[in-house]
Curated annotation (Swiss-Prot):
Entry keyword DNA-binding: no
Superkingdom to which the source organism belongs: Bacteria
PANTHER family: 3-DEOXY-D-MANNO-OCTULOSONIC-ACID TRANSFERASE/TRNA GUANINE-N 7 - -METHYLTRANSFERASE, PENTACOTRIPEPTIDE-REPEAT REGION OF PRORP DOMAIN-CONTAINING PROTEIN
SUPFAM superfamilies from the UniProt entry: S-adenosyl-L-methionine-dependent methyltransferases
This protein's UniProt keywords: Methyltransferase, S-adenosyl-L-methionine, Transferase, tRNA processing
Identification of the protein by name: tRNA (guanine-N(7)-)-methyltransferase
Pfam families given in the database record: Methyltransf_4
Length: 238
């Protein structure tokens, strides 16, 4: 097993240190997930290296590239890749069954424009993604760490926003979604204060769910129960 680190920040979003947050668990794979990893990793898997990817080499073409941090089981990421064949997609996930499920779904869907990391997202972003190379970064339903004493563990902080800004092209978009209203308010505060971004919301708050983000079964059930989901989209302008 590989140990994974993640950044910790203070209340002002100042980087403090890297902490051991969890272990990159093998997880309990189904037979289908294990088979998908074995058969699909050679073509869709990306082995981490601390040198920037040459995206045109990875995908065999020049195209806008979308990166998703923490894709879970991967169903929505595969759907996005299928719906937008002219774009390239990279997903990062630490949970191995999720990686296996994503690769299985991708193979069934026949997508060729998707690549996957099984690694810590902070390391991938810092070292394996070139500055100014991404058209969109997606962070959907990150852990809200709702207890106040855990807020410093929230991924959306000032230095993280700056890291994402560096990786986006001018005109690229950081798209965040959460089902925790207080976290959406925290995210909005962080992003409004982050230099080099422009909120794509007409009223300076959140945006309606864009067509490119699929409506998940979990989210649809939440809507029926009256639960909200908040989307934020910030464009890199400098």
């Amino acid at each position: 097993m590989s140990e994974v680190t993640t950044a910790e920040f203070n209340e002002e979003g100042k980087y403090l240190r890297k902490i051991r947050s969890f272990v990159l668990r093998e997880g309990r794979l189904t037979k289908g997930q294990a088979q998908a990893i074995e058969s699909q990793w050679p073509t869709m898997g990306l082995d981490y290296s601390p040198t920037p990817l040459v995206l045109s080499d990875v995908f065999g073409r020049e195209a806008d590239t979308v990166l998703e941090i923490g894709f879970g089981m991967g169903a929505s990421l595969v759907q996005m890749a299928k719906d937008a064949p002219a774009q390239n997609f990279i997903g990062i996930e630490v949970h191995k069954p999720g990686v296996g499920s994503c690769l299985s779904d991708a193979a069934i869907a026949g997508v060729t424009n998707l690549r996957v990391y099984h690694h810590d997202a902070m390391e991938v972003l810092e070292h394996a993604i070139a500055d100014g190379s991404l058209a969109r970064v997606q962070l959907f339903f990150p852990d809200p760490w709702h207890k106040k004493r855990h807020h410093k563990r929230r991924i959306v902080q000032a230095e993280f926003a700056e890291l994402i800004r560096r990786k986006l092209k001018i005109g690229g978009v950081f798209h965040i979604a959460t089902d925790w209203e207080e976290y959406s308010e925290h995210m909005l505060e962080v992003m409004q204060a982050a230099p080099g971004y422009k909120n794509q919301s007409s009223d300076g708050t959140v945006v309606p769910r864009p067509d490119h983000r699929p409506l998940t079964k979990f989210e649809a059930r939440g809507h029926r129960l009256g639960h909200g989901v908040w989307d934020l989209m910030f464009e890199r302008i400098a």
